[in-house]
Regions:
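Soluble catalytic domains of membrane acyltransferases
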Residues: 57-167
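A transmembrane-helix-recognition feature enriched in membrane-embedded lipid enzymes
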Residues: 1-63, 115-119
């Protein structure tokens, strides 16, 4: 990814979150009130829009094949290699609705992003603590058992190599 595309991606990422702060607050109030339908409606509308916007701004095209093979009547666990910053927007734009993601704990410290991620159903994992990693995987399992799909990048970080990196979770 060129430095200009990376800069454009992060400007769009945070610009979108700032411009849609009111919507974030509305979703958080709905979550606090137990109104999961409103939270889901907001997440299902804004996360794909944000993802497609990133791809458009950075000149990335997306073609998805095989959506018909993804069950609509039960949750799935999507497991993928993590090659670039684009992996998340590509997945979130390409799938029919957003899914929770197992994410490194450092992302929980980024203002606004962490709040959207929590609404999305992300689980934050401490990669250097085996017990905490197991708890995070148990939390992700509970989400899937509750009927929501989930995304895991088992390498634990972006990896540029051609072969599969060491699995960290």
């Amino acid at each position: 990814m060129s430095i200009l595309r990376t800069i454009a991606m992060f400007i769009y990422l945070f610009g979108y979150m700032i411009l849609h702060y009111g919507i974030l607050r509305r979703a958080e109030r709905a979550a606090a009130a137990g109104d999961t339908a409103t939270v889901e409606q907001i997440v299902n509308q804004h996360i794909p829009r944000w993802s497609r916007g990133i791809l458009k701004v950075t000149g990335v095209s997306l073609s998805v094949e095989g959506l018909e093979n993804i069950p609509k009547d039960r949750p799935c666990v999507f497991v993928a290699n993590h090659r670039s910053y684009y992996d998340i927007p590509l997945l979130l734009a390409g799938l029919e609705k957003p899914h929770g993601i197992l994410a490194k704990e450092e992302l929980e410290k980024i203002p606004l992003l962490n709040r959207w991620m929590k609404l999305l159903g992300c689980v934050f994992v401490q990669r250097d603590d085996v017990r905490a990693s197991v708890r995070a995987l148990n939390d992700a399992t509970a989400i899937v058992e509750g009927g929501r799909s989930f995304v895991i990048f088992p390498e634990g970080t972006r990896y540029k190599g051609e072969e599969l990196s060491l699995i960290h979770i």
